[in-house]
Amino acid sequence: MKLINMGVALLMTTTAISVSRAQTADVIVNKYVEAIGGKDKLAQIKTKSIESTTQVMGNEGPSSINIVDGVGYKVMSEINGQTFITCYTDKGGWQLNPYAGATTPMPLPDELYKQGRSVLDIAGPLYNYAAKGNKVELLGKEGNAYKLKVTSKDSIEITAFIDTTTYYMTKVVASASMMGQTMEVTSTFSDYRKGDMGLVFAYIVEISYGGQFNLTTTVKKIEINKTIDPAIFVMPKS
């Protein structure tokens, strides 16, 4: 009987800890959403247009991102006279990558598309996460950040770091396939500023691809709900 009682007590304690962690994760997520503008404003974002510059391997050039929520995401950059494009839509994706020897746009492999299509979610994976089928678990703290494990409905996992003071997202760690190999991709966000509609965005994004090379994007301009022609997401014919 004592063993049964101990087992029940242990189960209740474990359940209580799990519930407490979930509640704490929700508190952190809610504070993050509020810090970047609040759920009401995030719900109003239909499109986002970003003008920026990108530095990679000592070279710099203009870049841009255009997003229509749930419809299409397209990032373009020009480095050393070469144009790089990655595009996701609700049906598939394509890319133009001269570094991989490509001279014409090519469809994204299914696995790469699955890993990256979350970029179609314009408000991000934490906003309204449960309704999207995402799961969030608090892993603890690392330095001055809360560490959250975010699992999408497609079972794609990322680790998000939320500053304990500002509640801005400071870093995201994910796995990605590039040129036939899987690597850890770390995105670091800084220089947060308030812009259109009172929304707050990071103006500097640094990405490390498995320590092999780094990419830094510095935002120049962000426009919310600007008209974006969906035709830009269609892969050009070779």
Where in this protein do the model-derived segments appear?
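Short solvent-exposed loop/turn micro-motifs enriched in small/polar/acidic residues
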Residues: 57-59, 68, 78-80, 129-131, ...
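Gly/Pro-enriched, hydrophobic low-complexity segments
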Residues: 144-234
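Bacterial Sec-dependent N-terminal signal peptides
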Residues: 1-25
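Generic beta-strand structural signal
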Residues: 67-69, 88, 138-141, 162, ...
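N-terminal mature ectodomain segment of secretory-pathway/periplasmic proteins
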Residues: 27-101
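Flexible, processing/modification-adjacent segments and terminal tails
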Residues: 21-28, 34, 95-156, 176-183, ...
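Short, surface-exposed charged micro-motifs
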Residues: 64-65, 83-85, 135, 157-161, ...
